Amino acid sequence: MSMVRSFFDGLTNVLSGAGTSVDKRVHARYGLNIVDQHQVEASYRTSWLARKIVDMPAHDMTREWRDWKADGELIGKIEAEEKRLCLRERVTQAIVLGRLGGGAIYLGIKGDDPSQPLAVEHIRPGQLSYIAVFSRWQLTIGQEVSDPEDALFGGPDYFQITSIANKVGVRIHPSRMVIFKGAHVMRGIGSQWEDAFWGDPIYQAVGDAIRNADSAQNSFASLIDEATYDVIGIPGLMERLSQPGGDAQLSKRLDAARQGKSNHRAIILDSGEGGKDAETWVTRQVTWAGMPELMAAFLQTVAGASDIPYTRLLGTSATGMSATGEGDKNDYLSSIATKQETMLRPNMVRIDAVMLRSAGIKDELWFDWSPLFEMGEKERAALDKLKADTAKVWGDSGLVPIDALAKGAQNLLTEDGTYPGLDEELKKAEAIVAPDADVAPVVANPDDLGLTSEAKPKPLLKIVGDAAPRPLYVNRPLLNAAEFIAWAKAQGFKTTTPADDLHVTILYSKTPVDWMKMGTDGWGSDAKGNLDVAPGGARIVEPLGDKGAVVLLFTSSSLSWRHEEMVRNGASHDFDEYQSHVTISYDASDVDLSKVEPYRGVLKFGPEVFTEIVEDWKPTGGEA
């Protein structure tokens, strides 16, 4: 019976020898050369490239730190506790040690036996005394816990400190240690349990690439000393050397040539007889063609092996047409964000469970990692505008209570540092004594406002003080009426609205509403309830309505938000849309409005005045 053999053309090719015994590649094998503690330390301390590969991701993981989802007071307490413990610095150090082969953070609990399990639920305020960082080589670990039902499964049953004076031999329960591991090690034939627990140093997989790059750089540096060299030709050199005293004569000749070059900046050579048998001296230069590209190739290999972009690792700009490096940077930061979630967050959750209780805070709070992407001024401004627009949309929708939304927006502005000092100013604003709960937010008498006589609102509307549902008209009197009228006169208005009637309308609601539900103004008012509209911005003078009014239109987000807040609380607005304005005059037929320059100064408004609507109201005579 004949034997039939099948040959497959692919990875194995008997004609070309690929994949067969004559192919050199089939004899290649990976060897496991364990990088020991001394090599790790030597690499980290002597190679700038090795150090950056370890430090850079660790610092990037903690660079922007985290944002707590809590109110400003709680966030302040948490940040104070973090600073006391130097938490951010300790975590960064532990990540570095983890990348060097393993690190750990010890939670130092005051008055506790470190060898006993940590009862997190029994932590009292102030009990977390300190946190300490150890490398794997400062700790001895016990036996592996192999029971899958044990909470310590896969880890040691104890740790022992081996490098602290007066504490040698102290055993620590694993619940008091937070482990920062190196690269994952697969449990196999060639791996020890301790190595599998701590993980590999980063250098175990990247070491060859780093050594090749360092070697290429050192070799290139050595060649610099030989950048130029001299080629000297001496006729009959070998014959002279074979004669007695030939060596001395050659040395003497070369010394004379060097001395002439040094003293006279000239080389004296024997030109021979008729140019025959003449000495020669030629300076040549080493060609560096391809050397920079070769070194760059080694460094690119290191960048790929370490998962750090070439431009980030070396601090260089991207090369190539239209290259910005943004794609590489975004990919890198995305990988850092992944490490934060999968590697760092579980450890932070364990630390926070103890730290928050020690700070007297419930451990139900949670956090997000702060964005890693660094934005320019334009990008930041665009993002801030987007956040503001989003807050406005949620406020307009009525799905989120306005007070809760305002508090969240204030926390956001405080945390991202958009407005320095905002936190203190908000505390001052909150410290202002609010009116009693049983007092309606209604001004019963204009004299109580403390306004000047010309700024008091004209008593054309009936002022009331009870809280029964009724139509509502809300306005703010213009305090700097004299300045405003002087501007109007200068623009050609013969008569203007009387000073005591100049105001801005906030709400005109024919729908009866509970005035108590309108709340108190918190949109930009100062301690006295006054509101200033800053100079400039969009301002227009044009007719408005069917009663001959000419008004100054202006924009104010504080007035708009306050109007929308009242509408959300049940009021109506019986006009097409809300537009803040001050009525200049009801008699301006002889004024060419196209030539009027709008009022650009500050508009100072007094506190809100709540009144009922007067249905048959008509404009009165103007101020001459």
Curated annotation (Swiss-Prot):
Keyword match DNA-binding: no
Other information: This homolog of an antiviral immune evasion nuclease may be due to cryptic prophages, or it may play a role in regulating the endogenous antiviral defense system based on cyclic nucleotides.
Binding site for 3',3'-cUAMP: 106, 617
InterPro entries: Acb1-like_C, Acb1-like_N, Phage-assoc_HI1409
Catalysed transformations (reactions): 3',3'-cUAMP + H2O = U[3'-5']pAp[3'] + H(+); 3',3',3'-c-tri-AMP + H2O = A[3'-5']pA[3'-5']pAp[3'] + H(+); 3',3',3'-cAAG + H2O = G[3'-5']pA[3'-5']pAp[3'] + H(+); 3',3',3'-cAAG + H2O = A[3'-5']pG[3'-5']pAp[3'] + H(+)
Active site, per annotation: 503, 505, 581, 583
UniProt superkingdom: Bacteria
Stated role: Counteracts or regulates the endogenous CBASS antiviral defense system. Phosphodiesterase that enables metal-independent hydrolysis of the host cyclic di- and trinucleotide CBASS signals such as 3'3'-cGAMP, 3'3'cUA, and 3'3'3'-cAAA.
UniProt: 3',3'-cGAMP binding residues: 106, 617
A GO molecular-function descriptor: hydrolase activity
Keywords noted in UniProt: Hydrolase
Name this polypeptide is given: Anti-CBASS protein Acb1
Family: Belongs to the anti-CBASS protein Acb1 family.
